[in-house]
């Protein structure tokens, strides 16, 4: 036994003697240590005092202590100062009688008051719940209704509702405690009295029937209507049958001095329900649950009779006496109320527990001790933040910081964090306990590989498993015996950060078929000085992006790489001299294309300068320069003069850069620029070889045709619609 206890004992904390913090703490003077400890203590006290929950509890204690009968001057003075500082000033606010809305009055409000025993607390909570049910069922009529309960002590004391309060205002702390003579022993938190003449009737019944523990005296309208009938209550329904025999009494005002309680007691006899003619009814029960059960059935039976009486009393069907007696015996037979042989329910207890669940769901805080904890409302269940079960709580951070309750943003962020933690806990608790290994083949790749996944095993029931006893909080994560382990790990992390050895990890070769360093080697200039443009087909470089199957674990079996041809930057090898030469060329081309633009009715550029040149224009000029150079080389090789080549080049540049509409002689419709450009290059090369400029002739002939046709304004508008916005001529 001793060895088992030593095994379950927590491992002691080992202090590292070489720890710098520990050495500083030993060298620190005692005065400074005391100051630091006092600062920490005051900080903790300040945090508690600023807590809203602590202020709420303190206000409740002050309210209850102020209402006690203690008359010590010092005690009252201290309470007065505390109440001035904490308790908000203002009158007591009550909700509507039947519409509570969001401001509900708690039933079990006995907090921080130890003058009541545990048994009396339960009795007060239960009686206060009965008052709240009577209000919700609309049994009460104003303040002239009385419910009393005999306590379990030997002093023959009673609990009764304070006179002047409506039933929805009564709580466990406001109930008045009196003796058999009506003397107030505890006036509750509101210091209210009781209806003395009404309690005299209750006291007389308690003396005549020692087994009676609870009495209800109600003036419900529907019951008063049945009590005024000569026929009385008829056994028309099951609710009327379970009441058994009922008594009747010709009611007189209780305030009269000559009233005889013996007559009321005689009419009541051994019955549980007594109808007071033209006034209401009186219910006596062995327990609060029994009395509530009888009162509820009485009201329902009276409602049934009043509705059925519209057809006439002669037309009503009365059950046989045997059926009535059988229904009464079944309601009193406690053996028939057993559920699976585990719980013995007395009369009214099962219905009472269901009503308590209704009240707790409505956040009335009944304080009821449930006999069926599994049916207890979740809103009323107390949740503990301390849980030694490592399986119930998912792995997460265990540090808790202090929340500034005055900052709304921090409070809202804290609530969101708690919500996320609860969602993670639900996901963790609902995760399967049994898994099976499943392998998938990757598709979309040349060499597919196997992807292993662990999924829920549907063949194993969820309730199966081996229970494990949690004997220690470090059962699944044992504490280390080396006190220097944390410091060594911390120093190693700091050293790695200082050296800069951390990296993003290995570079993925799946995302890119070739790296940019390899591309730079592949696009080196040839022997003739050209870079990549003359041999694009031979140097097709594929780059690509991968699907989310490479990143997302759920799609590992469907990993694909999407390729595209690498397009280098056309200006990556250009120097400053080439760019300046290009700018001069653009200016020269604009000056040459000005007459053509004027004849065509539009212009492409407006004073193109080095700062205003667009990238698209530069790409076009770069392509034209390459085409012109190739045409010039072909012309020189064929023996053509440079003037003819220049004329051909000017025709190409004029027809392409000015973006003029080129018409074929047979087809007057305009042709697209993108499809026309390669054909013009071929025509230029062909004309250079033959010694003629067919492209120039075509351009001139088409231009002459356009001048001779002299299109109308509508045709000009149609032509302008086919060009880009920056190509149109600006209106001055």
Curated annotation (Swiss-Prot):
Region feature Disordered, mapped onto this chain: 1-22, 684-732
Biased composition (Basic residues): 716-732
Keywords: Actin-binding, Cell membrane, Cytoplasm, Cytoskeleton, Membrane
One Pfam family linked to the record: Aldolase_II
Family annotation (SUPFAM superfamilies): AraD/HMP-PK domain-like
Chain's role: Membrane-cytoskeleton-associated protein that promotes the assembly of the spectrin-actin network. Plays a role in time-dependent memmory loss and the retention of conditioned behavior over time.
Gene Ontology biological-process annotations: actin filament bundle organization; barbed-end actin filament capping; long-term memory; memory; receptor localization to synapse; short-term memory
GO cellular component, one term: plasma membrane
Family statement: Belongs to the aldolase class II family. Adducin subfamily.
Ranges of compositional bias, category Polar residues: 685-705
UniProt subcellular location: Cytoplasm, Cytoskeleton; Cell membrane
Entry-linked InterPro entries: Aldolase-II_Adducin_sf, Aldolase_II/adducin_N, Aldolase_II/adducin_N_sf
Identification of the protein by name: Adducin-related protein 1
Membrane topology (UniProt): Peripheral membrane protein
GO function terms (MF aspect): actin filament binding
Gene3D superfamilies, per database record: Class II aldolase/adducin N-terminal domain
